[in-house]
Structure formats: structure tokens, C-alpha cells
């Protein structure tokens, strides 16, 4: 399982946007990935990949999706690992 190695706010550098509502107040961030319709979710304690659904209460009405971006969610996760922002649980 992947976990964040930095504060969730640091993920803004990679295009993550603060969640709306209570999730945002809790310091959670998300990034929608057009290729594969995935949503990357991060807080100070967890990193998760979910299917991107329009009525998700964490996502803003105008999601921060870059449709011209040709990366998949796995490409982005790889870049986050290389940037030392994500690591394995227990290490």
C-alpha cells in the first residue's frame, strides 16, 4: 500500500486540488485523470485511487482534470514515487 511521505498540501505542486466540503477542511486533495477516468485522493495518512464519478462529494463541480494530459494514473503515481512523495507502508 502506498502512503504519502509529505504533507498533503505538497501535492498541489503536481496539480492536486483541495477537496470540497468536510474533506477539504480535513486537508484532503484530489486529482482527476482523464485517461482511464480515475481520481487520485490523498490526505496526510492515505493515498488512494478511485474510479472518477461525477457525484463524488470530494470533487468540485468543475473538476481539475487536464484532458490534454496523456499520462495515466500509473504514470502520475510513478512520478510521485520518483519525487519521493509516496512510499510503501512500513518503510
What name fits each language-model region?
Residues 85-91:
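Short acidic DE-rich linear segments
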Residues 2-20:
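Amphipathic alpha-helical segments
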Residues 80-81:
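Structured beta-rich ligand-binding regulatory domains in large eukaryotic signaling proteins
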Residues 3-4, 42, 49, 88:
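Absolute N-terminal positional cue centered near the fourth residue
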Residues 19-77:
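Acidic, low-complexity, intrinsically disordered interaction modules
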Amino acid at each position: 500500500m502506498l502512503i504519502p511521505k509529505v504533507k498533503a498540501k505538497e501535492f498541489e505542486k503536481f496539480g492536486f486540488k483541495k477537496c470540497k466540503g468536510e474533506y477539504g477542511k480535513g486537508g484532503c486533495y484530489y486529482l482527476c485523470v482523464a485517461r482511464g477516468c480515475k481520481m487520485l485522493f490523498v490526505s496526510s495518512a492515505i493515498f488512494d485511487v478511485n474510479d472518477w464519478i461525477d457525484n463524488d462529494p470530494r470533487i468540485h463541480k468543475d473538476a481539475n482534470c487536464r484532458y490534454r494530459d496523456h499520462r495515466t494514473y500509473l504514470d502520475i503515481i510513478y512520478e510521485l514515487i520518483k519525487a519521493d512523495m509516496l512510499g510503501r507502508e512500513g518503510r
